């Protein structure tokens, strides 16, 4: 019999990503000037953090190490991550922990609704970890959160950023029936890179999920995003745009991939601001209602302002016939 001893000292912090410990370290590139942001520290930032803590909430801003946390929290914009801080997937780009998640918190819907009210949000973004361990992938919990927010803050518009509900029959339909204002699901990268970057997901399943939202309820805005700088080609990015438009996706976001640790996927290159502008111009010409493309663009970055622009863009398109 062989006994394997735990070499961690009692009370020592365990590594955040033990599932990636076997991977060789990848090089970390120095960030260019256009990527760097100011460290957070304002009084409003501290107030936002306190409200999040008081309601025992998890935010993707913190868990994913978002570079925009200082700017967003200073505006009292925080993206709530429901169903815990532990994901059942192990995507090579993501900083969220992987493992066996805890049971769902039955108080979470009301806690989220309370935080939304205290922050005075006009528009809120709700995302989640993947919960492959749940029969419906967490769809019913999403619905409970949406309904709790609507009861407490009926004037607040709701944007959800969901997992793919892979092999969860009826889950998508359940969430769409709750009628969020925006349904976001990120494709994340080009199909060629899925096996390395997003191994637990399927590109065309994700694309079909977004198309299905429009089939069920055409009034719901659909949104999706990709990261660049992972080794994709320009032609592949343009093909993803075409795929998204064929699925009637309204809003496209494109941002620079930033490597959380040396155990995560390496940055292939930093895409320049001019290249992002070019992507935005091309995407607009393909018919998206709204496009956000910049090095620091993230799914929920400026979501409040973007939702207003999205509604205006739809109204303008309808008036043109």
From Swiss-Prot:
GO cellular component terms given for this protein: cytoplasm
Stated name of the protein: Lipoyl synthase
Entry's EC annotation: 2.8.1.8
Pathway: Protein modification; protein lipoylation via endogenous pathway; protein N(6)-(lipoyl)lysine from octanoyl-[acyl-carrier-protein]: step 2/2
Annotated CDD domains: Radical_SAM (cd01335)
Protein residues bound to [4Fe-4S] cluster 2: 87, 91, 94
Pfam families: LIAS_N, Radical_SAM
Biased composition (Basic and acidic residues): 16-26
Enzyme class: transferase
